[in-house]
């Protein structure tokens, strides 16, 4: 006896229309349109999972920058100073500290300033040494 695929087809269509729950108009009712919209929704979801990560990183950087400027540093100088000081906090944690505990953030900024100051001294010494060697070579 020949078996037609009515039950399987109905189940497949029903599953797709169920995924379209909450959509408006034909996108919720009509299988063909619902299927297209569900596929499009999957694409949006994939894209926006990536965008969420970007958006949070931008938000953290904006918060850190605002707090850093209150302490007399730019974002880039703060991050470079923290790297020189050996502070290994990620942007998410730094942003959380900046929002919730400003005193601790000020201490971190002071550490960054101290590390930048000592690094500037080393750079100036290296520049002076380079200039001395070039003057000796020219003579």
Swiss-Prot record:
Q: GO molecular-function annotation terms?
A: rRNA binding; structural constituent of ribosome
Where does the sequence pass through the membrane? Answer: none
Q: Which UniProt keywords apply?
A: Ribonucleoprotein, Ribosomal protein, RNA-binding, rRNA-binding
Question: Which GO CC terms are listed, alphabetically?
Answer: ribonucleoprotein complex; ribosome
Q: Which GO terms describe its biological process?
A: ribosomal large subunit assembly; translation
Alphabetized Gene3D superfamilies for the sequence = 6.10.160.10, Ribosomal protein L20 (1.10.1900.20)
Pfam families in the record, alphabetically?
Ribosomal_L20 (PF00453)
Q: Which family does it belong to?
A: Belongs to the bacterial ribosomal protein bL20 family.
Function, as annotated: Binds directly to 23S ribosomal RNA and is necessary for the in vitro assembly process of the 50S ribosomal subunit. It is not involved in the protein synthesizing functions of that subunit.
Protein name per UniProt: Large ribosomal subunit protein bL20
Lineage at the top is: Bacteria, Bacillati, Bacillota, Bacilli, Lactobacillales
What is the primary gene name for this protein? rplT
């Amino acid at each position: 006896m020949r078996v037609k695929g009515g039950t399987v087809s109905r189940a497949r269509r029903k599953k797709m229309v169920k995924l379209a729950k909450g959509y408006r108009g034909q996108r919720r009712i009509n299988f063909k349109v619902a299927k297209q919209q569900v596929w499009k929704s999957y694409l949006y979801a994939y894209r926006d999972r990536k965008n969420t990560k970007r958006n949070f990183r931008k938000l953290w950087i904006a918060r850190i920058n605002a707090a850093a400027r209150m302490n007399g540093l730019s974002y880039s100088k703060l991050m470079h100073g923290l790297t020189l000081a050996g502070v290994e906090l990620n942007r998410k944690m730094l942003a959380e500290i900046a929002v919730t505990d400003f005193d601790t953030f000020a201490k971190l900024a002071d550490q960054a300033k101290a590390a930048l100051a000592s690094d500037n001294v080393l750079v100036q010494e290296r520049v002076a040494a380079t200039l001395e060697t070039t003057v000796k070579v020219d003579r």
